């Protein structure tokens, strides 16, 4: 069954004019929601993501509660890695921990390939369930970017400085580029499968790429990103790029064959556009503001919207994920304000 969906988010991704600014929030599904916390008392992240009905419920929850204009699939960026031979465990309070970190070209050569229908059928089944029976807004599929995935695979888990990752990149370029190629292949196959299952847009998260300078990005990372976006672009859905602490890289992203440049709060929207970012833009509220009084939030959001609405192709989002401490009522109120304020301004 083909469902009719609200396409405001997709229109903004394509740089088209919209009646109001669409909004969704990174990590909108999860830790700040009482319903989610009750589910987590019974089920682990692994159990939720491997149960299509439960995962679909968690994914749809913020759409119903906050009236956001897009859903993003509830899963972890590490989800596809076990399929290629990476032993990943998500440890509470730590994050992803990998027992077999990459240390050599031989380690890279041992990595396999992903077959999504066989390796992650539960993810594709969740997408099909959401897009055929549950959602009235577009579903965003996603993947981690090769650099961020590689950083976990080399460090063995989260890192504050990524010294091992960058040392490997500099000292073992042959192994590094082999790893980038392997991960690019995986990301391409993984995203295409999500789109074929029903995702209407995809976002690539490069959470830790801000640790790399522009020159190194161009040499060691950008070629893989160019290949990913060029291949996935053939699927005909909008593609979004997002990283954290990476304001120095936005022009590099703008050069990629993508549709939307995601910004965090460190770079004002008007400054990004002044630097030459003329594609659609997504962002860029500091999630810390969500813990402030409403009067403070409202004035801050007005400023972001006034910058974003100066040209078509703007999607409101946070610069990073929702904190567990955020009151869900604040997010609901925020979405209503974004819609109403932007509708009034755009109608002038």
Swiss-Prot record:
GO terms for cellular component: cytosol. One of its GO terms (biological process) is heme biosynthetic process. Its EC number is 4.1.1.37. InterPro entries: UROD/MetE-like_sf (IPR038071), Uroporphyrinogen_deCO2ase_HemE (IPR006361), Uroporphyrinogen_deCOase (IPR000257). Substrate binds at residues 27-31, 46, 76, 152, 207, 320. The record marks 76 as: Transition state stabilizer. It holds the Pfam family URO-D. CDD domains: URO-D (cd00717). One of its GO terms (molecular function) is uroporphyrinogen decarboxylase activity. It comes from the Bacteria. It catalyses: uroporphyrinogen III + 4 H(+) = coproporphyrinogen III + 4 CO2. It is found in: Cytoplasm. Keywords: Cytoplasm, Decarboxylase, Lyase, Porphyrin biosynthesis. Coiled coil: none annotated. Pathway: Porphyrin-containing compound metabolism; protoporphyrin-IX biosynthesis; coproporphyrinogen-III from 5-aminolevulinate: step 4/4. Its main location: cytoplasm. Belongs to the uroporphyrinogen decarboxylase family. Homodimer. Catalyzes the decarboxylation of four acetate groups of uroporphyrinogen-III to yield coproporphyrinogen-III. This is Uroporphyrinogen decarboxylase. The lineage of its organism: Bacteria, Bacillati, Bacillota, Bacilli, Bacillales.
């Amino acid at each position: 069954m083909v469902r009719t969906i609200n396409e405001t988010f997709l229109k903004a991704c394509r740089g088209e004019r919209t009646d109001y600014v669409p909004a969704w929030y990174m990590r909108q599904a999860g830790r700040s929601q009482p319903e989610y916390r009750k589910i987590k008392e019974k089920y682990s992240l692994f159990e939720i993501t491997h149960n299509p009905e439960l995962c679909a419920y968690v994914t749809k929850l913020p759409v119903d509660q906050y009236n956001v204009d897009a859903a993003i699939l509830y899963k972890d960026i590490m989800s596809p890695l076990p399929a290629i031979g990476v032993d990943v465990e998500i440890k509470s309070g730590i994050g992803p921990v990998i027992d077999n970190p990459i240390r050599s070209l031989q380690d890279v050569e041992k990595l396999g390939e992903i077959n999504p229908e066989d390796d992650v059928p539960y993810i594709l089944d969740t997408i099909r369930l959401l897009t055929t029976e549950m959602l009235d807004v577009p579903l965003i599929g996603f993947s981690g970017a090769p650099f961020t995935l590689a950083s976990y695979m080399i460090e063995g888990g989260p890192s504050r400085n990524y010294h091992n990752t960058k040392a490997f990149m500099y000292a073992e370029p042959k192994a590094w580029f082999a790893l980038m190629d392997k991960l690019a292949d995986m990301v391409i196959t993984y995203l295409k499968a999500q789109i074929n299952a029903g995702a209407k847009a995809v976002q690539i998260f490069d959470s830790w790429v801000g640790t790399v300078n522009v020159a190194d990005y161009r040499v060691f990372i950008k070629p893989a990103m160019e290949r990913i976006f060029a291949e996935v672009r053939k699927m005909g859905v909008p593609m979004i790029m997002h990283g954290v602490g990476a304001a120095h890289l936005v022009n590099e992203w703008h050069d990629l064959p993508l549709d939307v440049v995601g910004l965090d709060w460190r770079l004002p929207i008007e400054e990004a556009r002044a630097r030459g970012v003329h594609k659609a833009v997504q962002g860029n509220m500091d999630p810390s503001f969500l813990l402030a009084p409403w009067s403070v939030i409202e004035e801050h959001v007005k400023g972001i919207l006034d910058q974003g609405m100066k040209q078509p192709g703007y999607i409101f989002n946070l610069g990073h994920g929702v904190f567990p401490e955020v009151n869900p009522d604040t997010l609901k109120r925020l979405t209503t304000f974004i819609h109403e304020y932007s509708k009034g301004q755009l109608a002038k």
